[in-house]
């Protein structure tokens, strides 16, 4: 969470956005699409949604099914709703790979997803949609 919050603040500052952010934890990656749908149905409205997660491969094919289900669920909601969504799901073989893809000083897939979300929100605002 600490790195996520740092990246979020950088994105807001870089774009000079007036942003209010709420962080929600879910049980696991598989729950991301359902949590996204719930957030979109909530009384409170947000300009965009950032989903971050990590699935580490085990010894069975379960990993493949879970990753595909998460990605399909998020994509279906994205296409259906048209809402700005940043999506950073690490699909890795080990914790070391996850750490390498979430380093604050180099490659950071969460930061990339956050920057993509900020760009999508700016696009939606430019078209009067957010």
Which ranges hold each PLM region?
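Single conserved hydrophobic/aromatic residue that forms the stacking wall/gate
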Residues: 1-12
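Short beta-strand elements in bilobed, periplasmic/extracellular small-molecule ligand-binding domains
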Residues: 15-25
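Short, ordered loop/turn segments at secondary-structure junctions
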Residues: 26, 53-55, 90-95
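Glycine-rich phosphate-binding loop
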Residues: 34-74, 130
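Short, acidic/small-residue loops that bind anionic groups at enzyme active sites
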Residues: 64-91
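Phosphate-binding/catalytic loops
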Residues: 93-108
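A charged, well-structured terminal subsegment
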Residues: 107-130
């Amino acid at each position: 969470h600490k790195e996520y919050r740092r990246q979020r603040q950088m994105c807001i500052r870089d774009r000079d956005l007036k942003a209010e952010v709420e962080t929600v934890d879910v049980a696991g990656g598989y729950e991301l699409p359902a949590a996204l749908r719930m957030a979109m149905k909530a009384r409170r409205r947000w300009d965009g949604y950032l989903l971050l997660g990590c699935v580490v491969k085990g010894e069975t094919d379960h990993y493949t099914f879970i990753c595909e289900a998460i990605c399909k669920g998020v994509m279906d909601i994205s296409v259906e709703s048209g809402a700005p969504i940043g999506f950073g799901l690490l699909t890795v073989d080990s914790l070391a790979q996850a750490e390498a893809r979430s380093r604050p000083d180099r490659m950071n897939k969460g930061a990339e997803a956050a920057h993509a979300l900020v760009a999508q929100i700016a696009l939606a605002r430019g078209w009067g949609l957010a």
